[in-house]
Structures are given as structure tokens and as C-alpha cells.
A protein has these predicted regions:
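Helix-loop-helix junctions that connect adjacent transmembrane helices in secondary transporters/permeases
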Residues: 147-238, 403-481, 612, 683-697, ...
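Conserved catalytic cysteine-centered active-site region
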Residues: 85, 97-98, 241-249, 273-284, ...
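Short acidic, glycine/serine/threonine-rich loops at helix termini
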Residues: 74-79, 120-123, 222, 231-233, ...
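Flexible, low-hydrophobicity surface segments
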Residues: 1-162
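C-terminal catalytic domains of large/alpha subunits in multi-subunit enzymes
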Residues: 67-68, 239-244, 274-279, 308, ...
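Catalytic phosphate/nucleotide-handling subdomain of diverse soluble enzymes
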Residues: 462-524, 539
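Thiamine diphosphate
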Residues: 232, 253-276, 280-281, 495-503
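Glycine-rich loop/linker segments at domain edges
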Residues: 6, 12-15, 82-85, 161-208, ...
């Protein structure tokens, strides 16, 4: 292959590193209205009255909107970026009289500059009826205090939701008699695991610019992963036709799932629609930390049974998830906690997976890389590590006895067959990379420091099978170059480059001959968006199919110009020539010009792809940590990982994805946490309090690949974006256990907890 599986530089790399104007705030007029939001100081309250009279008199203020400007009995909407009908409930109003978390929107203020808007915000007088809040998600289900008591709350999908019970979702599934299987096991691990909410903390905060175009339509330029879903969300929130909304995206300064929720879009859209003036809203870092869409807090009760020789026979999992004040992504994230952890163990005879998603008066949760699988894998993989210790077995040897194999029917994975899998090879590769045999379990380095290793496995999906859609449009231009139009959003991942590589491979042309345009709801073909690890696998397949069709048509038109049958010509990427006489040829440029002059053979195609399967990528990770038993400090000296993502379309970009995900997983394990005070106020409201590991906080990260070949993916590719965050959690927590002999069931694991555990043992 000439372009696929080659380490090309990102197409936008030079523009980014040289500081060219590519992000939203670089591209828009600076004299637009500034929009800011007045937010609730209470976790649960009703706005009795709101007085904006004085604030409206501030010079430069254009408009102030409150709940009185939004019909409270109107149909609600969701901000989740999901295919319609969304699994997430319709539980929001643009501005609701009932505020449900500290940071919920009370008023929208628009003015000519920040100074006047900030002054007006301080002059708005609000009288609240403060209500008792639901702040403990353990007590939320069937609590007499209802987060959503309203009658116009609506669930479009059969997910077991009931707002009168504070239930955003409930589900049960299983196979076999799990209780009987566990009763017959020699060893049963039975523990509850708890992962806290944590932030995506992308560099570019939420931001949106809106204007009215020549035809009176609302144009929205937003830092989003989901242009088509955002269009629907905006239209639903404003109660206007979708045909009146256009959404496009510039380059995006990071998303990691946060921008799969339309967090910022509806507010400037409302201002512009009402005033007919351009406006922008840019979240401060405080707002992005306290009123965004973080990972769901989850608690997982795992019962895992095995024989005395280490064969896992049954897994019983109950997950309780905290969706916060609104239900975005609640019903779908919780499913992955079981459906992306249990299938790793292909020899299990029975499983049961039950889940509840509850409303509380915390910040609304959303999508974050890993999307629920991260939490579930921490629980299940930690239980497997504990099983290995209980059986006095090497955790790697135990994994090799149990891992799902290619051709297996995967438990808890909707009856799907494993069509591509190099998981066992990944396990062996990581054992070699970290020098497991010499480092496991621990080594006392003296002076109170102990080094230890731990490992974990992970899987994810490749898109949402049978639901989400990827599309691509390809056309040959008049000078012999191609334009690829996509609806997927490049969030910095380099998908514009990888999709262009797929097209270039089929068309046998240099990568620079493919220009990429996207994503814009007016001109891009429909695409569900860049989430669920779908872009390479789903949109990539659409691109491959589209390029193949275009190649066929190029040959067909070339044959017509050469006056010979279509099956008598070949195409080498530059010319179409007659097979029997290669001197008879037409250049690509000649064919392009001919297509524009009286010919009926089109050289522009759109292809759409939906996959009935979601083949899992796999990853194995191992961590070496150094624990200071006096201070409790943990240093991650080395993290080694091996990934099976099928064929890596661009190995460099794939490796960078893995390294970034590993770093995020390390942060979730050791430092990152959202905590609330007794009144529901989040404490970590800036990056001073919310500790993200920097690159110099971590030692060496090594990533290798063991490639399987996925027959349903483009050139054998699967996904890479999400699986990479999942293994640090169980690997590091088990390494800490190997160092100090205390097992932790809650994340993050802090130095204080470690120091106290060591002191308690002494």
C-alpha cells in the first residue's frame, strides 16, 4: 500500500504550529454581541421573580432573556449529540424557571462588549425559592425529592426511564443462571468499585458564534463534534424549522466527547434569532469546569467467579450511574460499563448485567472518551487482578487462559462474533515490553520506596452498529485533483488526514491531491458525527466505497474518450490507458475537463455506510509505579501498551491517540476528581484545583501494535480513539496493591489514602 499504514503528517499541521487563524474566535468579526450567562447559585430552586430593569439600562446592553421569554410548557429537548430518536430524555428548556444544579442557566445577557455584560450580570436581581437537593446518587432512586417533577418531561426511547422515580434509565440483561454458576465456583470475588466524575478539560473551552445570513437563516459556527445533531438540538430548543439552521465547525481545540453535547450552542443562537444580530458565547474555564458535561460518576458491584485453575465462569455486574441534573448520554454510557467489559472473558458460562441511571442535583454529565467502558473496565479488570492474587496466579497467565478469541461469540455483546482479534498477542507483547518476569510483583528500592507493576485489558467498539451513519462525497476537479467532503469532525485527531489517505489509496494518487472539506450541514453529506470511535471505521468505509465508485467512473469516461470498452482500460492514478496499447491514454486532467463538456458520466459521488457490526479494538496496558511509603506519592515510571486496532491507517496519528489516552487514564486514576460541598457547589472550578497530569509528571510511555485484519473495515481497520484510555485504571491500581498490599476500590487513589493505608498496616 502506498498511503494506507503510512505515517503522513496531519494536513493541518503547519497551520496549527505556525499559529494561523483556524479556530472559531480567530475567524469571526470581533464587533459581534458578547453573550454571557447568569447562573444559579443553588443546586435546586425555583425562580420566584427576576428583575432585569436596572441591568437593561446599562449602556451597550442589547437584550436580556429569562424564563419569562421561554414557554415553560413547550416541548423539551436534549443537548445530547445522538441519532434520532435519542436515547437521552427530552428534559431541558432553553431557560427553565426550575434550576437543578449550581451553574444552571437563569438568564442570557447580550451586549456590545464584555464590560457592559459583566456589569449587567451583577445588576440582575433574582428571588429564589430554595429547595432541598438530591446530592447523593445512592439515595436518588425513588427519592420523594424529584429532580424532574414536570409533566412535559419525555423519553423517546425504551430505556426504562421514569422521571417520577428520578430514573433516567434502567436495564437488565443476561445469559445463563448466574447465581447457580457463581455458587458452583471455587472462588468468587465480590466488591463494589467507585469512579468519580472527571472533566475532559480540553484546551479550547466551549464556544459558538451565530449570525443571520442573506436568506434569513441562522448560521452557527461552533466548536463541536456533531454538526448535524447540533442543528437538530438548536432547532428543537428554539422551536424553529431545522431548514432555518446551518451549523459548521472550524478547527477544534480538543473535545474528547465533551463537544458531543451541545453545551454552548443554543444560547447565542437564541440571542441572534431574537435580535437578528451576530453574537458569540465563549465559556470561561470556570464555566467549562462547573457547567459542562463531565464523565458520569459510577458505582459498580462486581461478582466474578472462577475455578481453582483460573477459568472465569461467571460475571455479575450492577452499575449505578449519576447523570446529574439532565440526562444527556445517561442511558447509553451505562450500557458500555458492562457490554465493553464482560465480553473480554469468552469462557464465561453465564453473565448478568443490571444498571440504573439516576438524576441528582449535580452538574449534568455527558460523553467522555471511553464512554462508560472506562468505569466498567476498572471494576471488572480490578476484580480479575484480585482473582489472580487469590489463586496465587500470574495475572498475565490468568488472562491468557480466559481471553476472547477470534471466531468466538462474545458474551454480553449482542450475540456478535469476534471477527478480528489479536488480544492474546497484545498480552504477550506487553509482558515483553515491561519486562514483567523480572519486575512482577514488586521490588523494594530502599529508603521507603517500592517499585511494582500491574496490568489490565480493555476493549471498545467501532461505531454504533446498525444505527450511526458515515458519509463521504468525492469529486474530480478540472485540474485532476480531488475534493473529499465529509460530515465527520476532526477534533485534532487527524481524521481529515486518515480519510484522505483511504481515498488516496483507492485512487492511487498522492495524498496532497486530496483536499478535505468538512463539516457543514449545508454542504457536507450527512454524518452522525465524530464519536463512539466511529470515524475511521464507519466514515472511512464510506470514503473507501465512494473512492472505488469514482475510480470506476474515471475508467468508464476514459474508455469512452479512448473509444474502447470499459473493461479494456486500466487506471494508474495519473492516466487511463488501453491495456492492449498503453500508449493510448488520457490524463486525469483531460478526463476531468471532458466531464464538464457535454458528457453524461458524473465524476462526483456520495456514499453512505452503516455497519451491522461494531468490531472491538483491544488494548493491553502495564504500568510500573514507584510508591513512596512515607508520603504516599505515586510516580508512574513507565507505561507500556499494545493495541489491536486492525490496520493502523496512519501509525503516527494512531500512536499519538494512544499516548494521549493513556495520559488521561493516568489522571483519572491518580489525580482527577470532581467534588461537591454540602450545598452542591463543585470545588474544582479551575485547573489550579483540578489536577491534570502534565507530560513531565509521567515517565516513559511506549505504544506498540499487534495488527489483526477486520474484514468489515476500510483496509482492515478498526477504531482507536477510545480504547486507549481504559487500561491505566486497573493497571496502576493493581501496581499500587503490589507495592503496599492494600487494594483500593475507589478512584482517584490519592497520596493521603496511600500514606494512611501504609500507616494502618504498620
Amino acid at each position: 500500500m502506498k498511503t494506507v499504514n503510512k505515517p503522513f503528517r496531519k494536513k493541518d499541521a503547519m497551520q496549527l504550529v505556525t499559529g494561523q487563524p483556524v479556530y472559531m474566535d480567530d475567524l469571526i468579526p470581533q464587533d459581534c454581541l458578547i453573550v454571557k450567562l447568569l447562573r444559579s447559585p443553588h443546586a435546586n430552586a425555583i425562580v420566584r421573580s427576576i428583575n432585569t430593569a436596572v441591568a437593561k439600562k446599562v449602556p451597550g446592553i442589547e437584550a436580556i432573556f429569562t424564563w419569562e421569554d421561554v414557554p415553560q410548557d413547550a416541548r423539551r429537548y436534549t443537548q445530547a449529540g445522538q441519532t434520532y430518536p435519542e436515547a437521552s430524555p427530552y428534559d431541558r428548556l432553553l431557560i427553565d424557571r426550575h434550576v437543578r444544579f449550581v451553574g444552571d442557566v437563569v438568564a442570557i445577557v447580550a451586549g456590545k462588549d464584555e464590560k457592559c455584560v459583566d456589569k449587567a450580570l451583577k445588576l440582575i436581581k433574582v428571588d429564589y425559592e430554595v429547595l432541598e437537593a438530591v446530592l447523593d446518587f445512592h439515595t436518588a432512586k425513588d427519592n420523594p425529592i424529584l429532580v424532574h417533577p414536570e409533566d412535559n418531561w419525555e423519553s423517546l426511547a425504551p430505556v426504562g426511564a421514569d422521571n417520577k422515580r428520578n430514573l433516567c434509565a434502567h436495564d437488565e440483561c443476561g445469559n445463563g443462571d448466574i447465581d447457580a454458576v457463581l455458587a458452583g465456583c471455587d472462588v468468587v470475588i465480590d466488591h463494589v468499585y467507585h469512579t468519580k466524575a472527571c472533566q475532559q478539560a480540553m484546551m479550547e473551552t466551549f464556544r459558538t458564534y451565530c449570525s443571520i445570513d442573506t436568506y434569513g437563516r441562522l448560521n452557527v459556527l461552533s466548536s463541536t463534534q456533531i454538526v448535524f445533531h447540533a442543528r437538530r438540538n438548536i432547532a428543537n430548543a428554539l422551536h424553529i424549522p431545522k431548514s432555518m439552521v446551518r451549523v459548521s465547525k472550524p478547527r477544534i481545540g480538543g473535545g474528547f466527547g465533551a463537544k458531543q453535547t451541545a453545551v454552548s450552542e443554543v444560547y447565542p443562537a437564541f440571542v441572534t434569532w431574537m435580535t437578528k444580530k451576530p453574537s458569540k458565547l465563549i465559556f470561561s474555564r470556570v464555566e467549562s469546569q462547573t457547567a459542562s458535561s463531565p464523565r458520569h460518576e459510577m458505582e459498580m458491584h462486581v461478582r466474578l467467579g472462577a475455578t481453582k485453575d483460573g477459568i472465569v465462569k461467571g460475571i455479575d455486574l450492577y452499575t449505578l450511574s449519576n447523570t446529574g441534573a439532565y440526562g444527556e448520554h445517561g442511558p447509553t454510557t451505562v450500557g458500555l460499563s458492562g457490554h465493553k467489559s464482560i465480553p473480554l472473558y469468552g469462557k464465561a458460562e453465564a453473565f448478568r448485567f443490571v444498571s440504573d441511571v439516576v438524576y441528582t442535583n449535580h452538574m449534568s454529565a455527558g460523553a467522555y472518551r471511553g464512554y462508560g467502558a472506562t468505569q466498567g473496565l476498572f471494576a471488572v479488570e480490578s476484580a480479575v487482578n484480585e482473582l489472580a492474587h487469590k489463586l496465587n496466579m500470574d495475572p498475565i497467565a490468568l488472562r491468557l487462559k480466559n481471553t476472547v478469541q477470534e471466531g468466538d461469540v462474545m458474551p454480553a455483546y449482542y450475540g456478535a462474533v469476534n471477527t478480528s482479534c489479536a488480544l492474546d498477542r497484545c498480552v504477550l507483547k506487553v509482558r515483553e515490553m515491561i519486562d514483567w518476569e523480572h519486575k512482577y510483583p514488586a521490588r523494594d528500592m530502599g529508603t521507603g520506596k517500592i517499585r511494582a507493576v500491574g496490568m489490565g485489558m480493555a476493549m471498545q467498539g467501532s461505531g454504533i452498529s446498525g444505527m450511526d451513519v458515515g458519509s463521504a462525497t468525492l469529486k474530480l476537479n478540472d485540474d485532476g485533483f480531488y475534493t473529499l467532503m465529509i460530515g465527520a469532525a476532526d477534533m485534532g485527531t487527524g481524521c481529515d488526514t486518515t480519510l484522505a489517505q483511504i481515498a488516496a489509496e483507492v485512487l492511487d494518487c498522492p495524498l496532497d491531491n486530496i483536499t478535505v472539506f468538512g463539516a457543514d450541514t449545508d454542504s457536507s453529506p450527512y454524518d452522525s458525527g465524530s464519536y463512539a470511535s466511529s470515524t475511521t471505521y464507519v466514515t472511512g468505509k464510506a470514503t473507501e466505497k465512494c473512492a472505488m465508485k469514482l475510480r470506476e467512473q474515471i475508467c468508464k469516461l476514459g474508455a469512452e474518450l479512448l473509444e474502447c470498452p470499459a473493461d479494456a482500460v486500466e487506471f494508474d492514478g495519473k492516466v487511463v490507458f488501453e491495456s492492449a496499447d498503453p500508449t493510448r491514454q488520457k490524463t486525469l486532467s483531460e478526463i476531468a475537463f471532458a466531464s464538464q463538456f457535454g458528457h453524461k458520466i458524473p465524476l462526483e459521488f456520495t456514499e453512505t455506510h452503516t455497519s451491522p457490526l461494531s468490531p472491538p479494538p483491544y488494548m493491553v496496558g502495564a504500568a510500573e509505579v514507584e510508591v513512596d511509603t512515607e508520603t504516599g506519592e505515586v510516580k508512574v515510571l513507565e507505561f507500556d501498551a499494545c493495541v489491536d486496532c486492525g490496520t493502523p491507517i496512519n501509525p503516527n496519528l494512531t500512536r499519538v491517540q494512544a499516548e494521549g489516552g493513556i495520559l488521561q487514564g493516568i489522571g483519572m486514576t491518580l489525580t482527577e476528581n470532581i467534588t461537591y460541598d454540602k450545598n452542591g457547589y463543585p470545588a474544582e472550578n479551575s485547573l489550579f484545583q483540578y489536577k491534570i497530569p502534565a507530560r513531565n509528571d509521567i515517565g516513559h510511555i511506549h505504544v506498540e501494535f499487534e495488527n489483526s485484519y477486520e474484514p468489515n473495515g476500510p483496509f482492515g481497520a478498526k477504531s482507536i480513539g477510545e480504547v486507549v484510555i481504559n487500561t491505566p485504571l486497573p493497571a496502576i491500581s493493581d501496581a499500587i496493591y503490589n507495592a503496599i498490599g492494600t487494594r483500593f476500590y475507589e478512584l482517584p487513589i490519592t497520596p493521603e489514602q496511600i500514606a494512611m493505608a501504609v500507616a494502618a498496616k504498620q
